[in-house]
Amino acid sequence: MRIVVCDDEPLARERLVRIVKESGHEVVAQAKTGIEAIIAVKSEQPDIILLDIRMPEMDGVECAQELATLSHPPAIIFVTAYDHYAIAALKANAIGYLLKPANKDELLEALKKATNLNAAQLNEIRKLEDPTARPVREHIVARTHR
């Protein structure tokens, strides 16, 4: 999976990058702010973004809301020191919310969940884009024999 890591704390960002790389995923970009993260996502089109919440310029929740407007948004996993943003994160369509320092196993489980989710989404998109696919009949009405 292609991953963007966004955290304004260099040590936290480096730790996440190391765990991601050790797990066999590719870090395609690193960002220090929400604005940098949006730019990175638009240019790199990652599958997943690991996103801090409290950052300068634009916080992670605002960034996630902006990313959700993209035609192919990445799966969002928040990695933050603040647990009181969990509801806002879920409203921003996050699929994961981990507290710092992120436990390696929890992070890997969140990445696995995001990978599975993205695979399912890709299959649905391919079905929709397949010109040979039969049209879906959503409202079929039929008589029953009694």
Where are these regions (language model features)?
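Receiver (REC) domain active-site loop signature in two-component systems and cognate sites
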Residues: 53-55
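Acidic catalytic/metal-coordinating carboxylates
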Residues: 33-36, 59-62
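A Lys-centered signature of the CheY-like receiver
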Residues: 100
